[in-house]
Amino acid sequence: MLIPRRVKHRKQHHPSRSGAAKGGTQVTFGDYGIQALEPAYITNRQIESARIAMTRHIKRGGKIWINIFPDRPLTKKPAETRMGSGKGSPEWWIANVKPGRVLFEMTYPNEEIAREALRRAMHKLPCKCRIVTREEQF
């Protein structure tokens, strides 16, 4: 699981979901990538699940890069708790993703297998995505 080693503050405000991605919109490391088309909070479990789906499909011979990191805590209060009495305890670690951001990148010799691996990973993510190549622009 991806989580920060240590943080300055345990609890943070919720990040803004509006606007487009300012950086990280190009495929830079690999040949193919997954690009978000809508804003979302992606948890560390969803990132890990997508990574496992890709690695199991390509087996060997390729390389995967994860371009997002879940560095924001999301808090939640327990069920059947009255309002007030402070903010809830941190429940998840999330990455705030905006439209246009490249989430994963991959290099693999066979394009069909690479696209299928990325398609399987896209099903694990909570937002609409598309597969992009190094030549395409957003």
From Swiss-Prot:
SUPFAM superfamilies: Ribosomal protein L16p/L10e. CDD domains: Ribosomal_L16_L10e. GO terms for molecular function: rRNA binding; structural constituent of ribosome; tRNA binding. GO terms for biological process: translation. Keywords: Ribonucleoprotein, Ribosomal protein, RNA-binding, rRNA-binding, tRNA-binding. Residues 1-16 have a biased composition (Basic residues). InterPro entries: Ribosomal_uL16, Ribosomal_uL16_bact-type, Ribosomal_uL16_CS, Ribosomal_uL16_dom, Ribosomal_uL16_sf. It comes from the Bacteria. GO terms for cellular component: cytosolic large ribosomal subunit. Residues 1-25 are annotated as: Disordered. Belongs to the universal ribosomal protein uL16 family. Part of the 50S ribosomal subunit. Binds 23S rRNA and is also seen to make contacts with the A and possibly P site tRNAs. This is Large ribosomal subunit protein uL16. The lineage of its organism: Bacteria, Bacillati, Actinomycetota, Actinomycetes, Mycobacteriales. The gene is rplP.
